[in-house]
């Protein structure tokens, strides 16, 4: 029963979570086709895209108002729209918007996970965004399509510095 906010372009499996956990899972879909992707539910916020960051902020503010009435406890936010926002608004505007959002989420006891494809952006823009967060976890591929997970930084936390192999059969069990 932990409160979770999920911001995405394509909800995929998150649609099921939004339908099953309406009291503690808020889904924010930033997609012009949002109305055809999922039915209207009280915990689903449909935004026309990432072009207007104010629209996203307004939807989040609406969800925060609902959240203020729920019991306190662990909260999580997953922001999967970073790459799309960075492509549309570049580093300065994205960083300004994210700084405000992260501050708001922290003040409401959220742990935030941001998902970004660093290969889509210039290195300076990637670092401008990564520096806003207290940690960095990379998932990458090497030869033979093997995937690895490596924690690059984790503020005020102990962590394993070596990379970990990710095996699909382990994830599916």
Label every PLM stretch briefly.
Residues 1-48:
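Conserved P-loop
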Residues 110, 116-173:
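Phosphate-binding/switch region of NTP-binding enzymes
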Residues 3, 26, 73-76, 107-115:
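Loop/turn-to-beta-strand initiation segments
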Residues 90-111, 117-119, 125:
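Conserved binding-pocket/active-site segment within a compact domain
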């Amino acid at each position: 029963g932990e409160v979770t906010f999920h911001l995405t372009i394509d909800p995929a499996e998150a649609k099921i979570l939004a339908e099953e956990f309406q009291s503690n899972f808020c889904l924010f879909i930033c997609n012009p086709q949002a109305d055809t992707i999922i039915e209207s539910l009280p915990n689903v916020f449909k935004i026309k895209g990432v072009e207007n960051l104010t629209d996203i902020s307004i939807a989040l503010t609406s969800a925060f108002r609902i959240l203020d009435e729920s019991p306190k406890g662990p909260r999580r936010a997953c922001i999967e729209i970073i790459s799309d926002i960075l492509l549309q608004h570049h580093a300065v505007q994205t960083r300004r918007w994210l700084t405000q959002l992260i501050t708001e989420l922290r003040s409401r006891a959220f742990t935030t996970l941001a998902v970004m494809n660093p290969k889509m952006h210039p290195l300076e823009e990637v670092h401008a965004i990564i520096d806003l967060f207290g940690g960095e976890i990379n998932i990458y591929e090497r030869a033979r399509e093997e995937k690895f997970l490596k924690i690059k930084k984790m503020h005020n936390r102990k962590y394993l510095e070596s990379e970990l192999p990710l095996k699909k059969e382990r994830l599916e069990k």
